[in-house]
Amino acid sequence: MEQNGSFRVDSEFRYTLFPIVYSVIFVLGVVANGYVLWVFATLYPSKKLNEIKIFMVNLTVADLLFLMTLPLWIVYYSNEGDWIVHKFLCNLAGCLFFINTYCSVAFLGVITYNRYQAVAYPIKTAQATTRKRGITLSLVIWISIAATASYFLATDSTNVVPKKDGSGNITRCFEHYEPYSVPILVVHIFITSCFFLVFFLIFYCNMVIIHTLLTRPVRQQRKPEVKRRALWMVCTVLAVFVICFVPHHVVQLPWTLAELGYQTNFHQAINDAHQITLCLLSTNCVLDPVIYCFLTKKFRKHLSEKFYSMRSSRKCSRATSDTCTEVMMPANQTPVLPLKN
């Protein structure tokens, strides 16, 4: 157990868990989000992006910003929680973690509301000019969340603690709270409350979408595959929230209370759970691109064409290889072996 004038405990399994999970997420996330951004840049001229595509591009950028910090966290946990690079990079990594988490929540929220309007008020939504609104909302989200996260850049988020074997000191990153700090507790209560407010609004909008799609008269429905894609999109957004964001925010407040010393009975168990929810939280960078497949027709078509061309090229490659074999060795002939001396 770590004691440094606070109530901290340690979960040593994280020094193995985080490097593995973050390495996988980094590779998959950079490939997936980089590909998404390339597809958007290739298929959609910037002036033709509608509101929902603007939100999707911003969500991708937020994911990529966080992914760029993962190598720092991989090194940190590989060194058993010792921050060996510049202190400012600790502040920057924490800042981008906060920005990605709550930009993702915000953009998934406005994407859901956009789909809710399209289903609940289709005529009004079709007549609306939404590009300007998409740009405005995106700027508001970025500015408000970045301004809040700038606090992490202005303070020293590292602290020095002795090693367990007593052989020296190590530098922790974002692992120190002043005991019984009321301002920190208030901030965490506010953030957690805001998250669940947004989550319940998203849940309500998605339930309305599902109910409308399932109960709308057949004559008003489009092709069955369109309805099926819409339902899958709703389920995917809810899955991202339930898998990535909800567990972290359920554990966050009890964990904060334990870290501050208000409740220490189950501190170790809560801290263990907190490490797992941090891993789940980071998986949103990999799951977000899945949502795009259900939202844009061109994106799905592009993926289908690429997948089909890859399968065709493999078949052609195998066919060419077989043809070459038949040309080199016809079936009615046998190879001539060299004479032995």
UniProtKB/Swiss-Prot annotation:
Listed GO MF terms: G protein-coupled purinergic nucleotide receptor activity; lipopolysaccharide binding; lipopolysaccharide immune receptor activity; mitogen-activated protein kinase binding; phospholipid binding; platelet activating factor receptor activity
Tissue: Present in almost all organs including spleen, small intestine, kidney, lung, liver and brain.
Membrane topology (UniProt): Multi-pass membrane protein
Keywords assigned: Cell membrane, Chemotaxis, Disulfide bond, G-protein coupled receptor, Glycoprotein, Membrane, Receptor, Transducer, Transmembrane, Transmembrane helix
GO cellular component, one term: plasma membrane
S-S bonds: C90-C173
Gene Ontology biological process terms, A to Z: cellular response to 2-O-acetyl-1-O-hexadecyl-sn-glycero-3-phosphocholine; cellular response to cAMP; cellular response to fatty acid; cellular response to gravity; chemotaxis; G protein-coupled receptor signaling pathway; inflammatory response; inositol trisphosphate biosynthetic process
InterPro entries: GPCR_Rhodpsn (IPR000276), GPCR_Rhodpsn_7TM (IPR017452), PAF_rcpt (IPR002282)
Superkingdom, natural source: Eukaryota
Cytoplasmic face residues: 39-54, 114-133, 206-233, 296-341
Intracellular or extracellular location(s): Cell membrane
Entry-listed glycosylation sites: N4, N169
Intervals, Extracellular compartment: 1-16, 75-91, 156-184, 255-275
Membrane-traversing stretches: 17-38, 55-74, 92-113, 134-155, 185-205, 234-254, 276-295
SUPFAM superfamilies: Family A G protein-coupled receptor-like (SSF81321)
Family, per entry: Belongs to the G-protein coupled receptor 1 family.
Function (record text): Receptor for platelet activating factor, a chemotactic phospholipid mediator that possesses potent inflammatory, smooth-muscle contractile and hypotensive activity. Seems to mediate its action via a G protein that activates a phosphatidylinositol-calcium second messenger system.
Subunit description: Interacts with ARRB1.
Protein name: Platelet-activating factor receptor
Organism name: Rattus norvegicus
Organism placement in taxonomy: Eukaryota, Metazoa, Chordata, Craniata, Vertebrata
Gene assigned in the entry: Ptafr
